Regions:
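Charge-rich, well-structured scaffold segments of protease-associated domains
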Residues: 1-84, 100-101, 105, 111, ...
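Long, charged amphipathic helices and adjacent flexible linkers at domain junctions
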Residues: 87-89, 95
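Phosphate-proximal small/polar/acidic motifs at interfaces that engage nucleotide phosphates
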Residues: 88, 143-144
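Double-stranded RNA-binding/processing signature
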Residues: 91-92, 124
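Active-site cores that bind ATP or allylic diphosphates and position pyrophosphate for catalysis
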Residues: 93, 146
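A conserved active-site cap/scaffold subdomain adjacent to cofactor or substrate pockets
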Residues: 126-136, 142
Length: 291
């Protein structure tokens, strides 16, 4: 099904290339070959090893009584195994690759990316603000310079993916087949500019306010609060309030932004995947240079 949604497919292809040889690079749905190879015994063994008491976190929010929820959980899951197989997966080693896949499409889909930070990294708040400025809103640099100023793409944005021991920052854009080269050049120029030029204070203020507003809106629904609690337990082994997160965002300085931009956008760190009718397109490492 992902083959029919090229904007999803280009992300899957990028991920496969970026995390090459690691579990993070495998497609979530699997492949036809892997799914066909599943046996009843393999599924049962995986379920038994994975869905065990040490691996279980239950998050609940709303008009509830804590002790009542504890009793319900204890009763419902009392039959779960009390031990589990330890996870020994090593953090991935990223070697950025360039990939071009020809596919007859009305437009090309481009995904660029660098390594990012894990969930509990001390500079995670800086990366949140950096992403907001780069491509996280309609006032972001990519939206303004790629779409509004040059008309190269209708959809362009950046995003962060953070895991327990690694992460990534990706940039996506859909553009005309003959505009891929110019699009990549503009994105690379924006990444370099974040490294080389001090961030104006008004732009930093706008990004902080936008990010804080988004964080507050995201926690208005009970389902979002529930997911937020679960993530905190998974990655931090504790709970902390929205005020702590907002304070972390507010502490970010322009110097922090430039320092983290140098860290994330180091020369040689940028990978690229292009999907579309781009026969003969070549993307050299020099073109992706962030030095």
């Amino acid at each position: 099904m992902v083959e029919d949604t090229p904007d999803d497919l280009v992300h899957e292809l990028f991920t496969e290339s970026f995390w090459r040889g690691h579990a993070l690079g495998r497609p979530i749905l699997g492949t036809k070959e892997t799914v066909e190879s599943f046996s009843r015994e393999a599924l049962r063994d995986y379920f038994t090893d994975t869905y065990s008491a040490p691996n279980l976190i239950v998050a609940a929010v709303g008009n509830i009584e804590h002790e009542r929820v504890k009793d319900l959980v204890a009763h419902a899951f009392e039959g779960l195994p009390r031990t589990s197989r330890p996870v020994t997966e090593e953090p991935p080693v990223v070697v950025p690759h360039t990939m071009v896949r020809n596919k007859e499409l009305e437009q090309s889909h481009v995904c660029l990316g660098t390594s990012g930070y894990q969930q509990d990294h001390t500079d995670r708040y800086v990366s949140y603000v950096l992403n907001t400025i780069l491509g996280g809103s309609m006032s972001s640099r990519l939206f303004q310079n790629v779409r509004e100023k040059r008309g190269l793409a209708y959809s362009v944005f950046s995003g962060l993916s953070a895991y327990r021991d690694t992460g990534s920052m990706t940039i996506y854009a859909g553009c005309a087949n003959d505009a891929v080269g110019e699009l990549i050049d503009v994105v690379v120029a924006e990444l370099r500019r974040l490294k080389e030029e001090a961030l104006p204070e008004p732009e930093l203020r706008r990004a902080k306010d936008h990010l804080k507003g988004s964080l507050m809106l995201n926690l208005e629904s009970t389902s979002s609060r529930m997911s937020h609690l679960a993530r905190q337990e998974i990655y931090f082994d504790r709970q902390f309030g929205l005020d702590d997160t907002l304070a972390g965002v507010e502490r970010v300085t322009a110097d922090d932004m430039q320092r983290v931009a140098h860290d994330l956008f180091a020369d040689g760190s940028l990978g690229a995947t292009v999907l579309g009718a781009v026969n003969g397109l070549k993307i050299s490492r020099d073109r992706l240079s962030l030095g």
